[in-house]
Amino acid sequence: MKELLNMFNFYKAFKYYKAGKKSLKSKTHIDTQVKIKIEVGKESNRTEILNFLLSQFDKDPLYLEIGVRNPTDNFSKIKSSSKYSVDPGVEFKTNPVDFKMTSDAFFSKLKQNKILSCDMRFDVIFVDGLHLAEQVEKDIANALYFVKDDGFIVLHDCNPPT
């Protein structure tokens, strides 16, 4: 009897094995695996993400980038004719940004109506400035004040150890 039960269990397991093997060879499974591999291999970069968000607005969106360093890395690739850049130019001395100052100084002057307009609100604000926890927190707070209600704040590599 025990031998018969073992044979039955073996037959059942073998039946599942054959069904699994058959499904692994099916066109649907193979096509799905190819699609998964393609999706997993995709890599979006910050410029693509920012330009996608900017494309969601009906009009020319207002864009602000905090922490530009080298404009050819991202800022110059942004598809908006109304864009502003802020960077003190510490790492890239010849940085041709709109506002060569810290983000704290920029937001302070903006609030005081000393640069641009204190009523200005941005559709997309990209925060990629000083990567210290305290500064990222300040940049987010300032960005929240100056982003439109239907706008976006995008953060880049701001998971600092501090």
What is each residue range found by the language model?
Residues 1-162:
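A short alpha-helical cap/connector motif
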